[in-house]
Design a protein with these regions (language model features):
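Residue-level hotspots within well-ordered secondary structure
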Residues: 187-188
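Extracellular glycan-recognition regions
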Residues: 1-182
């Protein structure tokens, strides 16, 4: 748990063939389990997004999996299977709103998305027939972290996230954190 993260971002969207957003990430290999609570965010657009993402690269058209909370459409699980390919599917869970816990788990090529009200009891993020499990061969290393987009290029939004926990965060003896988080503002 790294306290509360306040992330300001703009960007056109995380969708279609290329993404424009802010990404706070950790590079890692192998399986992982990442969770966080989306405390709040300023939804400047109905499709503003904040959530947990795994990407093959930092390129705008990278294959990725993204479980996210939207401005007014609730939680979505979306993915892009190929470089520069389409992003989908489109269904959302409209009853979800901040604060909400999101979780993204990788086991080999299987990515599973969850949501929770309390961070203890997790439900699969199966939304309107769209699966919570996505099989995607991203390889190693992958970039894992928090993605935020306002959905309006040039217009900032602010997201507050806490309770960030990841099984891939290596810790050195004596409590020194060996992981380095980075932020990237990707744009088309």
């Amino acid at each position: 748990n790294a306290g509360t993260w306040t992330i300001e971002a703009n960007g056109a969207d995380i969708w279609a063939a290329a993404d424009a957003f802010r990404f706070t990430y950790q590079e890692t290999d192998g399986d992982f389990d990442l969770s966080a609570r989306i405390v709040s965010f300023t939804d400047v657009h109905e499709w503003s997004k904040v959530g947990l993402m795994a990407r093959q690269s930092l390129d705008a058209g990278s294959p990725n999996v993204f479980v996210n909370l939207t401005g007014t459409h609730g939680v979505k699980v979306i993915h892009r299977d190929t470089v520069g390919g389409p992003t989908g599917p489109d269904p959302a869970e409209p009853n979800a709103e901040a604060p909400v816990y999101l979780r993204l788990v990788r086991e080999g090529d299987l990515f599973t998305s969850y949501l929770s009200d309390d961070g203890a009891a997790w439900d699969l993020a199966e939304i309107a027939g769209a699966p919570a499990e996505v099989t995607l061969a991203l390889g190693d290393p992958v970039f894992v972290g928090v993605g935020v987009t306002s959905h309006i290029a040039g217009t900032l939004m602010t997201a507050e996230i806490d309770s960030v926990q990841g099984s891939f965060l290596p810790v050195e003896p004596l409590g020194k954190v060996a992981a380095t988080w980075a932020a990237l503002k990707a744009s088309r």
